[in-house]
C-alpha cells in the first residue's frame, strides 16, 4: 500500500496489551529508528523502566519467529517489505539489579525494582485470563504498579509476593528452581528461569509445618516463618481458600468466606461455621423441597424439617434467623427414595390408582397393613327409606335412613356423628350421634344412619345436606341429602283410625304387622299404645334387579294419605331393601305395592292412565333440581335420567362421572377451589385428572 512506502506500522504486544505506532522510512529504505530508540519507545508505551532488559521477537515473511537484537535486524525487516511489523515483547531482569539469590539463602542479596520483578508473574497470570478481560486488567495493573512502587517498602514486599502468583499452579519439586519456557519462544535467549516460590524454605520443614493461617492485618514481615505452598492434589491450581502469596490457608476476617460456586444469597447471612463439612454440604440439593421461609426451590445444603408444623422446611439461612434447635430436625442428605405428592403431601405407602381411598394389604401374619396416612372415609350405599322426591304432608315428622359404608382405612369410633352442612334446615338438631358399638365400625362394614326430620309447614321442595364427622367436628366422607316435596293438600287426607301407623321404619316380616297398611306414611307421631306399630331396626341391603319405567314414575310421586283396600293375600311385603311403596286411593281401580329391590314382585300391576303425563312432570321436576345443583346441560340431563330410570341419586353420580370424584372435590376445596360445579365440569373434561383440573383453574379456564 502507499502508506507503507513512507512509514511502517509497528504493532507491539506486551502483557496481553497491543499498542501501535508508525515509523518513517528513509529514502534509502531504512527505518528512521534505531534499536535503542525502539526499546525506549516500547518502554515508554508500557511504562517499563529504562534499564529493563527487553526481549523482542517478530514473525518474518515465512511465518517464523525471529529475534530483534540489533540494528541489522531492523534493516532486514525493511528489506522484507512487510505490510506491518508486529513485535512481541518479553521483559527480563534489570541489568542493574543485584546478583541472583542463591538457593540456600533465605533472603535475596539485594532488593530489585518491585515493578520489574512482578511483571513476569502478572504476565503469566494474564495468560489464563479470557481475552475480553485481559486488556482491562493489564491497564489497571500498570497504573497501580507504577504508583505503588515508591509508596513504601511494605508495598514493595507485597508486590514481590504478587509476582509469585503465576507459580501457584506449578507443582513444587525438591529442587529450589524450576526452569519454565514460555510457549512460542525459539531460542535459549527467550527462556526465563522462574524462581520457585518455595525456595526460601526447606522442603522437610514445609512438610512438617503444614498449612498455617495467615493474618493479613499484621505487617508482611511478621510472616517470615510462613510455610511454603503444598501442591494441590487435583492439579487444577490454587484453592480459593488458600492465600495466593504463600499457599497457606487464609483466615478471613469475614466469618464466611465467599464460595464462587454457590448462589450469592448463601454467602451473605449463612450460619457461621469453620468446619469444612459445612461447605461440602452446600453441594447437596433436596430435590422438590421448597423453603417455607424464603421460598427457594430446591433447598441447597442442610435441610431443617419442622417437628411442630406438618410439611414445613427451612433452609440454612432461614433457620439461622427464625429456627429453634428443638423444633427442627437437620437433614444433611436428601431422602434416598422420596415420592412427592403435588398437592397433599407424600403418597401413601400402597397407593391404588383405581380407587380414591388407600387399600390396606395383609402381612404374612394376616393383619391388615395400614397405609402411612390412614384416614376416615365413608361412602353412600343407598336410601333405605324416604327416597328423593317423596311427597309428605306439612309438619309431618319422619326419619330418614341412609346406608353408609366405611370406605376409609380407620375404624369409625364411638362418637362419630352426622352433621348438617347446608341446604334447608328442617331438623331440630345440627348434628346427630350415630349408634356405634364399642369396637366401632370396621372397614368395609355398613351402618344405617338415621336422622329425625319434621317437614316444613309451607308447601314446596326442600333439600337438606348432611355429612359424617368425628366427635371433634372434622368432616369426612361423601355428602348425602334428603329431598322431599311438601304438599298442603295431604294434610287432611289421613283417616283418624290409622293415625297410629308409622312407616318411618321399614316393614318387618312380622305377623302382627297388618299387610294392608304397607306404604302409608302418617304425618302424626306414632301413639305409644298403638299395636300396629313395629319399631324394629332397619337393616338395608343393596338394590338388586331391574326397575320398570312405571315403578320409576311412581317412585317420584310417593303420596302420603289413606288407603282402605287390602292387599291380596298372595302378595308378600317388601324386603328391607325396598326404597319406596305406593298405595292408591279407593277411587283408583286397583291397589299397587311396588318393591324397588325385592326379589318378589307383584303380579298384574295395572299401569295408570296418567303415566305419560306424570312421567313428563317428574322429568321436568328432576331437570329443575339438576339445574339447581349446577348441571346446566338439559339434553345430557334428560339422557342420564332416562338411562337411570329417573333415579335422582344414580343420575347425579352418572353426571359426576364416578363416585370416586368426591375425595378429589374435597381436595380441590382444601386447595381453595370452592366452586364444585366448575370442578366437576373440569374433572369430566380431564377424565378425573386432578392435575389437569388444577392447571385449567390456574390458567383461568372459564366455563363456555
Swiss-Prot record:
Q: Which Pfam families match?
A: N_BRCA1_IG, PB1, UBA_NBR1_C, ZZ
Q: Which residues bind Zn(2+)?
A: 291, 294, 315, 318
Ranges for the PB1 domain? 7-92
Question: In the UniProt annotation, what is the result of changing residue 664 to A?
Answer: Loss of binding to ATG8 proteins
GO term, biological process aspect, one: protein targeting to vacuole involved in autophagy
The chain residues annotated with the modification N-acetylmethionine are 1
The conditions that induce or repress this protein are given as:
By heat shock.
InterPro entries per the UniProt record, alphabetical = Ig-like_fold (IPR013783), N_BRCA1_central (IPR032350), PB1_dom (IPR000270), UBA-like_sf (IPR009060), UBA_NBR1_C (IPR056893), Znf_ZZ (IPR000433), Znf_ZZ_sf (IPR043145)
Look up what happens after changing residue 73 to A: Loss of homodimerization
Q: What range(s) does the UBA domain occupy?
A: 657-701
Zinc finger regions (ZZ-type), where? 286-336
Which ranges are annotated Polar residues under compositional bias? 95-108, 171-189, 223-233
| Compartment(s) | Cytoplasm; Vacuole
Among its keywords, does the record have Glycoprotein? no
Q: What is the recorded phenotype of mutating residue 19 to A?
A: Loss of homodimerization
Keyword Zinc listed: yes
Q: Mainly localized where?
A: cytoplasm
Q: Which UniProt keywords apply?
A: Acetylation, Autophagy, Cytoplasm, Metal-binding, Protein transport, Stress response, Transport, Vacuole, Zinc, Zinc-finger
- Cellular-component GO terms for this entry: autophagosome; cytoplasm; vacuole
The domain-related comment in the record is:
The PB1 domain mediates homodimerization. The UBA domain is required for ubiquitin binding.
Cite the record's note on assembly: Homodimer. Interacts with ATG8A, ATG8B, ATG8C, ATG8D, ATG8F and ATG8I. Binds to ubiquitin.
Query: What is this protein called in UniProt?
Result: Protein NBR1 homolog
Source species of the chain: Arabidopsis thaliana (Mouse-ear cress)
Amino acid at each position: 500500500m502507499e502508506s507503507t512506502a513512507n512509514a511502517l506500522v509497528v504493532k507491539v504486544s506486551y502483557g496481553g496489551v497491543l499498542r501501535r505506532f508508525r515509523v518513517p522510512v528513509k529514502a534509502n529504505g531504512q527505518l528512521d529508528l534505531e534499536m535503542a530508540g525502539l526499546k525506549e519507545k516500547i518502554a515508554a508505551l508500557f511504562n517499563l523502566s529504562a534499564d529493563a532488559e527487553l526481549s523482542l521477537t517478530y514473525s518474518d515473511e515465512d511465518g517464523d519467529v525471529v529475534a530483534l537484537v540489533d540494528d541489522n535486524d531492523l534493516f532486514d525487516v525493511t528489506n522484507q517489505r512487510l505490510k506491518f511489523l508486529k513485535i512481541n515483547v518479553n521483559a527480563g531482569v534489570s541489568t542493574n539489579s543485584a546478583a541472583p539469590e542463591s538457593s540456600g539463602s533465605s533472603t535475596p542479596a539485594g532488593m530489585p525494582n518491585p515493578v520489574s520483578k512482578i511483571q513476569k508473574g502478572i504476565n503469566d497470570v494474564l495468560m489464563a485470563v479470557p481475552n475480553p478481560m485481559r486488556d482491562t486488567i493489564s491497564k489497571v495493573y500498570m497504573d497501580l504498579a507504577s504508583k505503588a512502587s515508591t509508596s513504601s517498602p511494605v508495598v514493595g514486599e507485597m508486590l514481590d509476593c504478587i509476582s509469585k502468583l503465576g507459580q501457584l499452579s506449578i507443582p513444587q519439586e525438591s529442587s529450589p528452581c524450576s526452569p519454565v519456557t514460555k510457549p512460542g519462544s525459539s531460542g535459549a535467549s527467550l527462556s526465563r528461569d522462574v524462581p520457585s516460590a518455595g525456595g526460601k524454605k526447606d522442603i522437610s520443614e514445609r512438610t512438617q509445618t503444614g498449612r498455617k493461617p495467615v493474618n493479613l492485618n499484621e505487617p508482611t514481615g511478621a510472616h517470615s516463618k510462613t510455610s511454603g505452598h503444598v501442591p494441590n492434589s487435583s492439579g487444577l491450581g490454587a484453592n480459593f481458600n488458600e492465600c495466593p502469596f504463600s499457599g497457606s490457608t487464609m483466615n478471613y476476617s469475614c466469618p464466611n468466606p465467599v464460595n464462587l460456586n454457590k448462589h450469592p444469597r448463601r454467602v451473605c447471612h449463612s450460619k457461621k461455621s469453620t468446619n469444612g463439612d459445612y461447605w461440602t454440604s452446600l453441594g447437596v440439593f433436596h430435590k422438590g423441597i421448597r423453603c417455607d421461609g424464603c421460598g427457594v426451590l430446591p433447598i441447597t445444603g442442610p435441610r431443617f424439617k419442622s417437628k411442630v408444623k406438618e410439611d414445613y422446611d427451612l433452609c440454612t439461612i432461614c433457620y439461622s434467623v427464625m429456627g429453634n434447635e428443638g423444633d427442627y430436625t437437620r437433614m444433611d442428605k436428601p431422602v434416598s427414595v422420596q415420592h412427592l405428592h403435588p398437592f397433599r403431601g407424600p403418597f401413601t405407602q400402597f397407593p391404588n390408582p383405581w380407587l380414591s381411598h388407600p387399600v390396606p394389604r395383609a402381612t404374612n401374619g394376616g393383619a391388615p397393613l395400614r397405609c402411612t396416612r390412614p384416614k376416615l372415609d365413608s361412602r353412600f350405599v343407598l336410601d333405605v327409606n324416604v327416597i328423593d322426591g317423596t311427597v309428605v304432608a306439612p309438619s309431618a315428622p319422619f326419619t330418614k335412613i341412609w346406608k353408609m359404608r366405611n370406605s376409609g382405612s380407620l375404624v369409625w369410633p364411638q362418637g362419630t356423628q352426622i352433621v348438617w352442612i347446608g341446604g334447608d334446615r328442617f331438623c331440630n338438631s345440627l348434628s346427630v350421634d350415630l349408634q356405634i358399638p364399642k369396637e366401632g365400625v370396621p372397614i368395609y362394614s355398613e351402618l344405617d344412619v338415621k336422622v329425625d326430620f319434621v317437614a316444613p309447614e309451607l308447601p314446596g321442595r326442600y333439600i337438606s345436606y348432611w355429612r359424617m364427622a368425628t366427635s371433634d367436628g372434622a368432616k369426612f366422607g361423601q355428602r348425602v341429602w334428603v329431598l322431599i316435596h311438601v304438599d298442603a293438600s295431604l294434610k287432611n287426607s289421613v283417616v283418624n283410625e290409622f293415625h297410629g301407623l308409622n312407616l318411618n321404619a321399614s316393614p318387618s316380616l312380622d305377623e302382627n304387622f297388618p299387610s294392608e297398611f304397607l306404604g302409608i306414611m302418617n304425618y302424626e307421631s306414632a301413639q305409644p299404645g298403638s299395636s300396629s306399630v313395629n319399631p324394629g331396626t332397619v337393616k338395608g341391603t343393596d338394590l338388586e334387579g331391574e326397575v320398570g319405567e312405571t315403578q320409576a314414575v311412581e317412585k317420584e310421586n310417593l303420596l302420603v294419605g289413606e288407603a282402605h283396600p287390602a292387599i291380596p293375600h298372595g302378595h308378600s311385603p317388601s324386603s328391607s331393601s325396598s326404597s319406596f311403596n305406593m298405595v292408591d286411593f279407593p277411587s283408583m281401580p286397583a291397589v299397587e305395592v311396588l318393591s324397588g329391590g325385592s326379589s318378589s314382585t307383584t303380579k298384574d300391576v295395572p299401569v295408570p292412565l296418567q303415566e305419560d303425563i306424570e312421567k313428563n312432570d317428574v322429568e321436568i321436576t328432576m331437570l329443575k333440581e339438576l339445574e339447581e345443583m349446577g348441571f346446566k346441560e338439559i339434553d345430557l340431563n334428560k339422557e342420564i335420567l332416562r338411562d337411570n330410570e329417573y333415579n335422582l341419586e344414580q343420575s347425579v353420580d352418572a353426571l359426576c362421572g364416578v363416585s370416586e370424584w368426591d375425595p378429589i372435590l374435597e381436595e380441590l376445596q382444601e386447595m381453595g377451589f370452592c366452586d364444585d360445579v366448575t370442578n366437576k365440569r373440569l374433572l369430566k373434561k380431564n377424565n378425573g385428572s386432578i392435575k389437569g383440573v388444577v392447571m385449567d383453574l390456574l390458567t383461568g379456564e372459564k366455563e363456555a
